[in-house]
Amino acid sequence: MDKMKIIMEKGTERLKRGFAKMVKGGVIMDVTNAEQARIAEEAGAVAVMALHKVPADIRKAGGVARMAPVEKIQEIMDAVTIPVMAKVRIGHEAEARILEALGVDMIDESEVLTPADPFFHIYKKKFTVPFVCGARNLGEAVRRIWEGAAMIRTKGEAGTGNIIEAVRHVRLVNENIRLIQRMTDEEIYGVAEKFAEPYLRLAFSVKEISGLPKRVLENEPIYEGFTYREIVDGLYKILLEIKKLGRLPVVNFAAGGVATPADAALMMAMGMDGVFVGSGIFKSSNPPAMARAIVEAVNHWDEPDVLAEISREIGEPMRGQDIAELEVRMEERGV
């Protein structure tokens, strides 16, 4: 890669991360039409996520969940002045190109939609629009950041109104970061090698089909022209940055199962930079009141008296689901 290209890429990444920082400390709400988008904006959302169905309805409908119709996204973009995000299927570069051309402010490469690629996520550095991606653990987060994600969010278990998986993912990432901070650089390089292993799946599958040993050559490209060693080196640099910062080097939001002001406050108390709310707003009995309350909870997460007050007269939250009852675990999608 020539020097000018490296400089341009770093500049683009800085701009992408800068946009993500603009929504830090706020609430991003899933919406399916212009009316919902306006409710979200009036409640104080920092951005909206345009979908054809909220995650609870996607889960109920089954079948293949895809990018929202262009007309629906445009309708939402025309209705509000705050940033509009939209989801694409994991690995579906064509959907992402369409959204980039449409002018959305950020793309969510999301496990809520049916994955398109069983081996890889999109190489997000090829795009000028910033991406947000989900992560259950530090390995997933570091891989997505290396690929170019400007924002990370927990996966949680979308559409359930159950916060347990989001809590699990926050704890796993935070504890792994504390472990990294106690490790030597040599030990961290070993972690980078482990975190890079999912990129080998396609190469190993092809070699197994061909009756060859499951190993790759030093100069053998395995993902977007990168060799295994180049990927390891890239992940290693991010891990060293995490060791220095004591946190992810990008904005980190909670998502998946946030259904009440208390849920939102819990996520902020655990160190999150903000909150995505999917089904929790428009599957509640009083969406405008719930939306306002969750925004206030994020702003006042460390003030119990305020939280108690804003939790009054907000109606019933969405009906939740026990994780053990789920037929589909969306959080397990992706690598």
Curated annotation (Swiss-Prot):
- Binding-site residues for D-ribose 5-phosphate, renumbered to this chain: 30, 159, 257, 278-279
Q: Which GO terms describe its molecular function?
A: pyridoxal 5'-phosphate synthase (glutamine hydrolysing) activity
Q: Which PANTHER family does this one have?
A: PYRIDOXAL 5'-PHOSPHATE SYNTHASE SUBUNIT SNZ1-RELATED
- Family to which the UniProt record says this protein belongs: Belongs to the PdxS/SNZ family.
Q: Does the keyword Lyase apply?
A: yes
- Fetch the InterPro entries from UniProt: Aldolase_TIM (IPR013785), PdxS/SNZ (IPR001852), PdxS/SNZ_N (IPR033755), RibuloseP-bd_barrel (IPR011060), Thiazole_synthase_ThiG (IPR033983)
What protein am I looking at?
Answer: Pyridoxal 5'-phosphate synthase subunit PdxS
Q: What class of enzyme is it?
A: lyase
Q: Which UniProt keywords apply?
A: Lyase, Pyridoxal phosphate, Schiff base
Which PROSITE patterns does this chain map to? PDXS_SNZ_1 (PS01235), PDXS_SNZ_2 (PS51129)
Species whose genome carries this gene: Pyrococcus furiosus (strain ATCC 43587 / DSM 3638 / JCM 8422 / Vc1)
Coiled-coil annotated spans: none
EC numbers listed for it are: 4.3.3.6
GO BP, one annotated term: pyridoxine biosynthetic process
Show the active-site residues.
87
Pfam families xref list: SOR_SNZ, ThiG
